[in-house]
Amino acid sequence: ELLENHRALNELAHRLDPTRPTTMANVFMLEITSPILEIPDVNSYNLYFGWYLGELDQNDDFFDTYHAKYPDRCIGFSEYGADANPAYQSAHPEKGDYTETYQCVYHEHMAKMIADRPWLWATHVWNMFDFAADGRDEGGKNGENQKGLVTFDRKIKKDAFYLYKAYWSKQPFVHTCGSRYVDRTEDVTKVTVYTNQPQVELFANGKSLGVQQKGEYPFFYFDVPNSGETTLTAKAGDCTDESHLRHANEPNRDYVLQEEGAVINWFEIETPPGYMSINDTIGDILATTRGKLLALRIVQMVRANMKKNKGGSTGGMADMAKGMKINKSLIDMGKGFTVKRVCMMA
């Protein structure tokens, strides 16, 4: 029935306007061998490897596998992104920490991945602005999806905004990332600069840290000595940008998401030997005997709850999963989720 509905919609779209190709945004759970992909003129996928699950390189692997299997099919990237609260910063950005720093790591990878694959017919960064999402309470904001390159109130352009400006804008500019990351404990800190100019020179308290020429991508990385107070000045052509650093003896807790009952701070994680935590992936837990037994108990509880509800709505991701075909690809992807992420999505 689902396939027939999509075929009917595809035919209707062609009748209404034969000049326009049809397409469809597919979520990552859909196998690339699904017959639904044969219906529209061109295909596209929403992928969130490196944010909700898995690693960043899995985005590359997914598209390479698809293109190798179907070299004559058009494939696009219909949705990708990572939430970031610009108040949160880190010298050790990690998936799921909601830092502005990790959002840059994420989008730098995606920008490179896209640039290296010219056969992607279209790509859609998700999203330009943070937007309302009633069911969310995460990343320090209630009721917001923070995947935007600009904050909800349109007042702050996050660092990742300037990454895309470096690619898409002809207006000369230079931007130093991490201007909101002032207090830093590391003796040598990494500073990233984005620009659409051919070269960048970075100064620390007036002393040049070197000139870098633009390579294949418009990202420039500098190792900056961090002692006392430092004023950074990036120069690219006639453009300049200034920011400030300050050496701190202790991490600034304002830079880290504080969640009651959840260990998420990289400098606070203390898991006793022989134990696992909500920050471990489903795959790692299932690799243990006790983990398999726990999973079996959970499945039994879910089945009992479904019988109790007699097919009624349970809310959250559970409703989305109804009727979904469980396949090896879906199971492998699910193993990439941490327990914490699964609980947040339930």
What are these regions (language model features)?
Residues 258-285, 291:
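Compositionally biased low-complexity segments at domain edges in trafficked proteins
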Residues 238-265:
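Edge beta-strands of extracellular beta-sandwich domains
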Residues 277, 282-283, 290, 298, ...:
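N-terminal targeting or regulatory segments adjacent to alpha/beta-hydrolase or S9 domains
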Residues 1-213, 223-225, 229-239:
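Extended substrate-binding grooves/exosites of carbohydrate-active enzymes
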Residues 302-346:
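Compact alpha-helical subdomains of small soluble proteins
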Residues 218-222:
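Short strand-edge motifs at loop-to-beta-strand transitions and within beta-strands
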Residues 14, 18, 115-116, 290-291, ...:
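Sec-exported extracytoplasmic/periplasmic mature domains
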